[in-house]
Amino acid sequence: ANLESVLMMKPDLLVGWKSTFTNKMLQTPTFWQARQANVYIAESSLGAQSALTMDMEYKYIRDLGRIFNRNMEAERLIQEMQQSVAYTVAQTAHEKPPKALFIEVQGKHFRLYGHKTLAGNIGASLHADVIDTETPSISMEDVVEQNPDVIFLIVSDGEYSQADVIMNYVLTQPGLQGVNALRNKRVH
């Protein structure tokens, strides 16, 4: 949504990421507070120095439950999520952890979502061997060298309508055709 559309809605609460509330996007929290609108910024978007975790997401869900007076629904959702994780871990405990790559397409390189990211934490929590490097990006050559068993594509907020194009881009890269994830149709 753009600023004009949001202003026309006359919200009393806006929920978003840190990047949502800048002068280039939907303005700052001060802008909205002057219009009697509260702002909730997800903790996971604040650029924490520590790793982003599922526990932070559980906190986010609990916070929204409190804000909207839906505590029981929030706790039920968290419980379902935790049960799904426990089930997956139990079902895969006897298997070798798959080598998992979490990436976002950025030109000819990929932004890497490693252990300190929420995606990487989810992968590790679900019994995956998460591929990580010292740098925030990974080249196609490095993807070939790492040879992941599964690739998860991260599609950012403004690119949801392009998800199929992004998937097709990865699936049709000649240099990636020998990668296990592509050969075994495990790109998600």
PLM region descriptions:
Residues A1, D132, N180:
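Short, solvent-exposed loop/beta-turn-alpha elements that line the ligand-binding surface or hinge
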Residues A1-I67, E141-E145, D149-I151, G158-T172:
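Acidic/His-rich segments in extracytoplasmic proteins that coordinate ligands and/or metal ions
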Residues L7-M8, W32-A34, A93-K96, H115, ...:
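Extracellular/periplasmic catalytic domains that process cell-envelope and extracellular macromolecules
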Residues L14, K99-E104, I151-L153:
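Short hydrophobic beta-strand segments
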Residues T28-V105, K185-H188:
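Extracytoplasmic substrate-binding proteins
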Residues A86, A124, I138-E141, Q146:
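Small-molecule-sensing regulatory modules
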Residues R111-S137:
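Alpha-helical, coiled-coil/dimerization segments enriched in small aliphatic residues
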Residues V170-K185:
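Short beta-strand->loop
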